Design a protein with these regions (language model features):
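Short secondary-structure boundary segments
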Residues: 16, 54, 125-127
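Residues that scaffold the ATP/ADP-binding catalytic core of kinase and kinase-like folds
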Residues: 22-23, 63, 133
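Active-site neighborhoods of divalent-metal-dependent phosphate/nucleic-acid chemistry enzymes
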Residues: 84-123, 127, 131
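Short amphipathic alpha-helices and their capping/turn segments at secondary-structure boundaries
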Residues: 1-7, 72-73, 78, 111, ...
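Short, active-site-adjacent cap segments at secondary-structure transitions
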Residues: 19-20, 57-59, 129-131
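Short, well-structured N-terminal submotif of metal-dependent ribonuclease cores
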Residues: 1-50
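PIN-domain endoribonuclease scaffold, especially VapC-family toxins
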Residues: 39-97
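Acidic, PIN/NYN-like endoribonuclease modules and their adjacent C-terminal/linker elements
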Residues: 121, 127-169
């Protein structure tokens, strides 16, 4: 991860899972870029600004310590040069305001941090928490677009959205 700020004004806020995928799983077993790797490559090319919250980093460190201990020094090494650029933790009031829109209270700090960061896009593949109808109301109410890794690649012109299928017989 480069610590050079890209010229783009598009502010993309990755949730913990998206950031984890970008840092630990940018390539598959054959060395080909994963969706997360393609997003990381576009960031490194300056296609968007990556906005990282202290709340996401704290949660990421917990996940690394629990599930990916072997990657701890690598992840810390990639994030440390950017530590002074992390956005602040949301206040208890900011977190509480998100609770009606979250399916799990532990996601509330990340929802609030996205707003604090003044993000254009929240990047998440967590469809159980970030892509629910109530979460989509939250994002829309704060004028924040919600995209998956694939969706962000569509926004950036690297993929095409699949047409919606007609469920009628």
């Amino acid at each position: 991860m480069s610590d050079v700020s890209p010229p783009s004004s598009l502010r993309v806020f990755p949730d913990t899972g998206a950031l984890l995928s970008m840092l630990i799983f940018p390539r598959d077993r054959l060395g080909n870029p994963t969706l997360a790797g393609e997003v990381l490559d576009l960031y490194q090319q300056g296609a968007f600004a990556l906005i990282i919250s202290r709340a996401v980093v704290d949660e990421l460190e917990e996940v690394i310590d629990r599930d990916f201990v072997a990657y701890r020094s690598q992840v810390i090494g990639l994030l440390a040069p950017r530590a002074n650029q992390f956005t602040r933790w949301p206040t208890p009031e900011e977190i509480a305001a998100t609770l009606p829109f979250t399916t799990a209270p532990e996601d509330a700090p990340i929802f609030a941090a996205t707003v604090v960061a003044q993000s254009d896009i929240v990047l998440s593949n967590d469809f159980r928490a970030f892509h629910t109808p109530q979460a989509k109301l939250f994002w829309a109410g704060h004028q924040i677009a919600l995209e998956s890794l694939y969706g962000l690649l569509c926004v950036l012109g690297r993929r095409q959205r699949k047409p919606a299928t007609d469920p009628s017989p």
